[in-house]
Amino acid sequence: MAIDPNSKPRLAPGCRFGENNNQRVLLMPERALRLNGPSLEIVSRCDGTRTVAQIVHELQKLYAKAEPARVEQDVLGYLGLLSDQRALDFQ
């Protein structure tokens, strides 16, 4: 699935943040996904107010030492993975 840079991702119904052994996790109806580093930075921005392009830009600034194209590729790939797992909705 191609992700529209103008779409606004948010957690899908039934998905929420939680903690397990002092580790942030994304709780989904059938499983939990451990979040750390970049994955936590990406998911925490999926609040339905930021566009995909804004999220990419924020992460490019946060990881300024990394190649911007690589950051964009990683963000889009992770959003696609979460979409495939039905953890995100896009407005």
Task: Describe the function of each predicted region.
Residues 32-91:
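Long, charge-rich, low-complexity alpha-helical segments
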Residues 1-28:
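Long, low-complexity, charged/polar intrinsically disordered regions in eukaryotic proteins
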